[in-house]
Each structure stands twice: as C-alpha cells, then as structure tokens.
Amino acid sequence: MKVAVLGAAGGIGQALALLLKTQLPAGSHLSLYDIAPVTPGVAVDLSHIPTAVEIKGFAGEDPTPALVGADVVLISAGVARKPGMDRSDLFNINAGIVRNLIEKVAATCPTALVGIITNPVNTTVAIAAEVMKKAGVYDKNRLFGITTLDVIRSETFIAELKGLNVADVKVNVIGGHSGVTILPLLSQVEGVTFTDEEVASLTTRIQNAGTEVVEAKAGGGSATLSMGQAACRFGLSLVRGLQGEANIVECAYVDGGSEHAEFFAQPVLLGKNGIEKVLPYGEVSAFEANARDSMLDTLKGDIKLGVDFVK
C-alpha cells in the first residue's frame, strides 16, 4: 500500500505525515512531496521513528516521482488562511496548485484514491473532477473532499457540552466544507437531546471553528494539527477499505448523485474501489432541512467556480 502526501512540508502535511508514519499498516510506503526543498529532510526526520512504514521525500517542481504506484493520494498543498480571510479568498492561489497537481495524478496514478484537503474544498474538488474528465480518467468513486475535520470538531464539541465520552459520539456532517455549507446533523446523535438554543449555538460554532483557530493563532497559522488528525483518520479509512475491511463509513464531499448539488458531503461506504455506496443521511429536523436548503445556492456557486476555472 502506497500513500502519497502532496504538500507534505506544510503545517497540515507534516502533521499528517507524522500520523501516517505511526499508524499506517506495516509494510506500507509513505511518499512525501512538496515544492519546498526541506521535504526530503522531513522524510529523513520521520524515518527515524521505529515503525514498519517506508518513507521517502521528494522536492521540486514535479511531483511525478512521488506519485508512481500510489494507491492513495492526499493533497494538502496550497496557502493557509490568515485572519480576515475566508476559504474563498484562498481560491485565487490554491485553484492553480490543485489543477497542476491533479494533472500529474491523472498522468501518473489515474486509479489512485484522491483525497483533497486544500481549501476551498467546495471548489477544489470540482476543479479536480474537471481536470480528470479532460484527461479521460475521471472516476467519481475515487475522488473525495476531506470534510472529516467538521466531523471530529462536532464529536469534540458535543462531548464537551454534554459531558460524554467522545469515543461514544457519532455524528454525520453533510453539505460542504465552509461556513453555512457545513451542517452537523445534531438531531441524529444517539442518546442526546439538545435544546433549540444548543442546536443553534453548536451549529454556528462548528461552522466557524476554523476561524476560531485562525484568530487564536493570531496570524501564525490555521487549523493544521487537527486537520492533520482528520486527514489521517480519513486516509486510514481509505486504506482499510482498499484492503477489504468491511463497514468502513466516513462522511466525505463527493460526486455521489445527490439530489441537492453535483458535489455534496454525506456518509459513504468505502471499499476496494473507493466509494462502494453513497449512503442516505437519514431523517433531518426542521432546523436542519431549512439550513440544508438555504445553503444550496452558496454550495452550487462554489462548485460552478471550480468548473468554470478549468473550462
């Protein structure tokens, strides 16, 4: 099993690489790529950790050597948010980065499962899909926008609010991966009831949690460590699915035939072909139905931005 991390010298990439080095199955290969010259050194640093995961780092303009034979590609390359920016401000820089990297993925490892972390995810996933369509290699079951950070934040904040063991909290988050498009389905959390006020405040906190971190870091970065953990959780789920493990379900932003938008985050069953099945997200409350319906114009606009960028 070979996993490639593109953008591996950045804050998310280094955290993700560290977690993968310690958690990938024995015998796996971990390939790190970044434009930054430090990247081979990051790999050397991580290679001193005593796990049976081979690691190699590549720097420079061309990610191809890192991508050869990759089963899973996780893309975190790009610029991070700073105070006052929202995820769409990142579009102007990150759109081109994702396009260029996906062109190389399409040419080098077209059947790999691709997980996109680079923001704005609502748009960068649409860019990736269009690039792969142009290259004639698009498989909607192999492309994912990683929204796991919204899920782990939801789990954490619910457990804190209700005094629960966080390991027992499971929550689906649907929609997209920015602002109002992030919709935690709090009405479905088992064994927990929320007041209307709690639902409103929790939903808003989850939607704005990225800004909470950006502001707390006072210009020194964005949510890199929690995103690294979220991306590792999702990446390991992709690997477990590829290895034939049953019942691996994660929420992800996918081209899943949603009635709501071309790309939509919802639970998916993972397997040897990536998405084995897009799962229904179930009954929602009136609050959630309203929030879902009112986000769709924003989400569709984000998607169109990506499609138009490639065309």
Curated annotation (Swiss-Prot):
Is NAD tagged as a keyword?
yes
Recorded superkingdom: Bacteria
Concerning SUPFAM superfamilies, the annotation shows:
LDH C-terminal domain-like, NAD(P)-binding Rossmann-fold domains
List, alphabetically, the InterPro entries matched: L-lactate/malate_DH, Lactate/malate_DH_C, Lactate/malate_DH_N, Lactate_DH/Glyco_Ohase_4_C, Malate_DH_AS, Malate_DH_type1, Malate_DH_type1_bac, NAD(P)-bd_dom_sf
Q: Which residues form a coiled coil?
A: none
* Catalysed conversion reaction: (S)-malate + NAD(+) = oxaloacetate + NADH + H(+)
PANTHER family, per the entry = MALATE AND LACTATE DEHYDROGENASE, MALATE DEHYDROGENASE, MITOCHONDRIAL
Q: To which protein family does this belong?
A: Belongs to the LDH/MDH superfamily. MDH type 1 family.
| Role of this protein | Catalyzes the reversible oxidation of malate to oxaloacetate.
- State if Oxidoreductase is listed as a keyword: yes
Q: Which GO terms describe its molecular function?
A: L-malate dehydrogenase (NAD+) activity
What Enzyme Commission number(s) appear in the record? Answer: 1.1.1.37
User: Where substrate is bound, by residue?
Assistant: 81, 87, 119, 153
Q: Name the keywords, alphabetized.
A: NAD, Oxidoreductase, Tricarboxylic acid cycle
Protein name per its UniProtKB record: Malate dehydrogenase
Q: Which GO terms describe its cellular component?
A: cytoplasm
Write out the GO biological process terms: malate metabolic process; tricarboxylic acid cycle
Q: Broadest EC class?
A: oxidoreductase
Task: Locate the residues binding NAD(+).
Answer: 7-13, 34, 94, 117-119, 227
How is the quaternary structure described? Homodimer.
Which source organism does the UniProt entry give? Shewanella baltica (strain OS155 / ATCC BAA-1091)
- Active-site residues (renumbered): 177 (proton acceptor)
